């Protein structure tokens, strides 16, 4: 039975019951009239009964419509208020160079697939409020169901109160039950101070729900406006954070508080703008040119990920072209024979990825390591690689954190990890030791050693010292380990170089070695 038929059936049953009650009452009145007709002394009572019957009949007819009329009127009024609010929101948001919450939903989902949940929850038509400051619902991204909650800055500054918190938590529960991803569109002034601790407690509930969903379903956050105070931990707990060059801000304490507490004068963008969190702090994973670019990136990431940890990543039809086969054969030409000569690892990745397509993650952060998604033979994979073009592909505090975080994400959602190794080791220096290189390096080991997905490691030129062990080595659990072979003359030349360097080093009390 379709939902429409079920609704029609539910509406029909009460109408039948009301009709039966009406017939019963009407027949009872007629029986009384017939009985009283034999008693002439009670003529006045007959007239009174007739009048009462007439009134009852009129009241019964009115009662058939009375339960529905107020509801219909309320829904119509709420819809009218919603249309007016959307027009007002469009005017305000466009003046700031931003889209409305509903316009963002149109960009995120396949056309015509969004279905809202709890549209009028938290509203008060008597006060002229159609709904609360968050929109929740489900739609489709490339044909697969995805949940969303979008904060509406045009309603009370997008602040979070009891109604908003309950809607978000309900959406999270539904998404976990359905095992579908959740996308958060953040544009909020934080907790609604008028509601006091009750508003703050809603953040606690959202934190808990986000942690419960972590590793179960993919969670993406798009920062499309302000996100300050405790609210920043909502996106920080998700898998991927996307920001824009303008209007995106994240910070625990804002510029005014910083100035009052420390005397430092700093702008919102300098404190926690999109560029800062993509290139400096490493909090975010992508910096969009604008909202449309950021949302398109989110759609792309969702295309590589499964709907939940219980599902496999989607497979894509693929047939290698002649040009791609020729590109793959150029791999040995891209990697220089001299192990100290830099090259662009992205060229290597494009040689092995379907159609040469590679979606980088955290492109601007810790550039000596490269991570991202690609397809090989139509199957999505995660790729981790050293970047010889930046600091010779060395591992440091930030790149270790970047690699570990990405490997854990791939492992959570069943994506095989391909590791392309070309690194001279860990970056030396007191700054690295003081910043916790031991702790961060251990995270990389933990990520690889605990991964349950297929691990394939390819050593392109060199893998020295501790960096060799942590970068997906056989010793910590890689399933397949390969090495790119050089031409014999290259190896011979490198061997002669080692002998020459060794003899010189012996005279000086030290040796210099280079891999081939």
Where are these regions (language model features)?
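Ligand-binding clefts of soluble mixed alpha/beta catalytic domains
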Residues: 2-516
């Amino acid at each position: 039975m379709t939902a429409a038929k079920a609704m029609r059936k539910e509406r029909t049953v009460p109408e039948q019951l009301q009709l039966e009650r009406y017939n019963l009452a009407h027949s009872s009145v007629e029986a009384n009239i017939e009985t009283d007709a034999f008693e002439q002394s009670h003529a006045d009572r007959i007239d009174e009964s007739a009048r009462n019957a007439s009134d009852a009949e009129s009241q019964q007819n009115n009662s058939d419509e009375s339960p529905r009329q107020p509801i219909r009127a309320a829904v119509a009024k709420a819809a009218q208020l919603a249309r007016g609010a959307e027009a007002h929101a469009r005017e305000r948001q466009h003046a700031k160079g931003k889209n409305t919450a509903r316009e963002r939903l149109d960009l995120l989902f396949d056309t015509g697939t969004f279905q809202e949940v709890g549209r009028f929850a938290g509203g008060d038509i008597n006060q002229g409020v159609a709904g609360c400051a968050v929109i929740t619902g489900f739609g489709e991204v490339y044909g697969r169901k995805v949940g969303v909650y979008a904060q509406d800055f045009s309603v009370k500054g997008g602040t979070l109160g009891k109604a908003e918190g309950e809607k978000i938590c309900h959406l999270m529960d539904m998404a976990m039950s359905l095992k579908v991803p959740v996308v958060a569109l953040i544009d909020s002034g934080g907790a609604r101070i008028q509601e006091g601790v009750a508003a703050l407690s809603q953040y606690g509930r959202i934190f808990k729900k986000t942690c419960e969903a972590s590793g179960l379903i993919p969670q993406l956050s798009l920062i499309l406006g302000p996100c300050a105070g405790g609210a920043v931990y909502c996106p920080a707990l998700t898998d991927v954070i996307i920001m824009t060059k303008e209007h995106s801000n994240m910070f625990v304490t804002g510029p005014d508080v910083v100035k009052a507490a420390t005397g430092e004068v700093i702008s919102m963008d300098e404190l926690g703008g999109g560029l800062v969190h993509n290139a400096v702090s490493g909090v975010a994973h992508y910096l969009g040119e604008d909202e449309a670019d950021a949302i398109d990136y989110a759609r792309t990431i969702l295309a590589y990920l499964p709907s939940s940890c219980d599902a496999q990543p989607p497979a894509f039809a693929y047939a290698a072209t002649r040009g791609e086969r020729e590109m793959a054969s150029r791999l040995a030409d891209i990697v220089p024979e001299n192990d100290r000569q830099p090259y662009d690892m992205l060229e290597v990745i494009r040689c092995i990825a379907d159609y040469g397509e590679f979606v980088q993650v955290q492109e601007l952060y810790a550039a000596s390591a490269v991570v991202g998604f690609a397809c090989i033979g139509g199957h999505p994979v995660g790729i981790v690689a050293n970047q010889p073009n930046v600091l010779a592909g060395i591992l440091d505090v930030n790149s270790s954190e970047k690699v570990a975080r990405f490997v854990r994400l791939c492992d959570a959602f069943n994506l095989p990890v391909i590791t392309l190794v070309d690194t001279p080791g860990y970056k030396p220096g007191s700054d690295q030791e003081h910043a916790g290189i031991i702790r961060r390096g251990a995270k990389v080991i933990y990520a690889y050693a605990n991964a349950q997905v297929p691990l394939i490691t390819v050593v392109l030129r060199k893998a020295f010292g501790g960096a060799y062990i942590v970068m997906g080595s056989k010793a910590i659990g890689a399933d397949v380990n390969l090495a790119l072979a050089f031409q014999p003359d290259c190896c011979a030349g490198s061997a002669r170089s080692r002998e020459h360097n060794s003899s010189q080093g012996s005279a000086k009390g030290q040796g210099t070695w280079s891999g081939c």
